[in-house]
């Protein structure tokens, strides 16, 4: 049986995401070409999956983008830890009653975060990521709410 994650789990996952992703942005050096390329590859894969309406793949590639954000910390231990966080998020996404509704809005915002980082605007990238994580958490909690009453 697949473990179902509840609202408290989601809040905890987003606490971890905020800690790692916002720290990665604030502590980052200017993006190196290979770092930008990895992020852009994840964004392009997300775009292709969205065009195919393969929402599970959209979620997977979007999370790969966020793994590359955490990768800016240059810590194999954080990378490994965040891989586990991503796996748990995938479980949550899969249990959301309408994964397409959840996944649809994020690509443009991921791209904006990349572009701000590429331009060296860490404060704006951090603000955009913070708002992104707040909105993502709230939407995910809303999507999970109907199923939590059963």
List each model region and its residues:
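Residue-level signal for the nucleotide or nucleotide-sugar donor/cofactor binding architecture
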Residues: 120
